[in-house]
Swiss-Prot record:
Cofactor binding note: Binds 1 NAD(+) per subunit.
Protein name: Urocanate hydratase
Keywords, in A-Z order: Cytoplasm, Histidine metabolism, Lyase, NAD
GO cellular component: cytoplasm
Gene3D superfamilies membership: Urocanase like domains, Urocanase superfamily
Co-factor(s): NAD(+)
Amino acid sequence: MTTHEPRTVRAPRGPHKTAKGWIQEAAKRMLMNNLDPEVAEHPESLVVYGGRGKAARNWEAFDHIVATLDRLENDETLLVQSGKPVAVLRTHEWAPRVLIANSNLVPHWANWETFDKLDQAGLMMYGQMTAGSWIYIGTQGILQGTYETFAGAAQKHFGGSLKGTITVTAGLGGMGGAQPLAVKLAGGVSITIEIDPTRIRKRLETRYLDEVADNLQDAIARAEGYKAQGVARSIGVQGNAAELVPQLVEMNWTPDLLTDQTSAHDPMWGYIPPVNADEDAGKLRSEHAEEYRQRAYAAMAAHVRAMLELQKRGAVTFDYGNNLRQRAFEAGVEDAFSYPGFVPAFIRDSFCEGRGPFRWVALSGDPQDIYATDKALLELFPEDERLQSWLTYAADQIAFQGLPARICWLGYKERDRAAKLFNDMVKDGRVKAPIVIGRDHLDAGSVASPYRETEAMKDGSDAVSDWPLLNFGVGIASGASWMSFHHGGGVGLGFSQHSGLVIVADGTDEAAKKLSRALTNDPGMGVIRHADAGYDHALDVARERGIDLPSLGIKDHA
């Protein structure tokens, strides 16, 4: 196709490639999989998730990327600048086949206003995290991490289970859509507010949401009934969180657990303010942009004020990394940061172990390949109770979106073992085609985000972004198949920088070497980052597992 028009995209399946190597073929299939209608939020606009997180800058750029990947040699590297292929360079076979940089701006200009001007001029693209790095796998991609968060809340506040509790949250997009099922897995009842009825339907169809209430009062009545019965159940309700959460205050009804995962990171294209019955939010945004922005900020302020009041009344309240607190603070809510972020509250100990999201995709397109890897991992890590529980549940309950895929959380000296296993399975034919291995940018050592992953670091190094740059370099030096460096994922422009790694297990001996190196060093950066910040748990892991940290007097004993 040469007209560069929107069209339905679906990744090729099977053991035969049209590119010159499996890495190039994998990159092409994963780019296309990001835009599969089962996967992407708005594929016709190249938007994958997270407000306007895109896979390619425009359809012309998409076509050029696909064509270039098909002709790319095994010792060449494609450079992609904010979703546009800009060069092919001769490198070497251990170099990444693709290097991606998305949304990066010099710090003084790292804001939405500058980005929007460049975006409108066709010069930039917002890549979110895994949208522009071609490793998004649908809502499952965040599900176990979301479960880890709610399980952490259960452990800290509710005796280890959310049974007999009600969680209220908002947002059923690509990220937030994991919340209802995650709360259910942790044993609880949830009410999730979502303004877009198509997103509600999508979560029902993919079994991430159980049922939809007629209104907020109906949702509360249903939730109270399930809570009394000790039943885990998820309820959706259509509405605007900036209106419904304050209604909870007015109704004098307080949930047990409260958070939010609307797209507050992007005030213009993510968070939708309340509008009058005779108004259209999209039209208001396009015709009266400044009024829309002001309304969005006012709505976020009202939303957070209500959350703060519910916190005072006893709701365990946390921020889910969408920068809602910062937006409310900018709108005049001085105590917006009175409730914590989810990472310091529940996840940091895992990061100290280099433990984070590890995902893989079957390029064959055959679900049986994923089920085979599930079984193999259960045998490889019999002592990991969380992994055993998760993979057993996932194999039975999780609906695939696009190419069959799986995610689990693994740490330092675990991811490399899993990758070796997968490569052996490709080599001996236990799976029908190569396997792509990647992760979210939300990981132990790959991101600087002071209101999310690096919030409240022990040594005050929240905003130091040397670490994701080092992570990016380490992946390149260690044999990754493609690497990405992005700005603004999760919390919006000006508030984060982060790196992504993807590597292909194609069954070859060379792949085995790359997998071992890359998937040891990448999670190792998480241990290193937290050990350097002074976390005792990370220091213990570094000593026990043999990481050479010269400034801390720890040497590799492996």
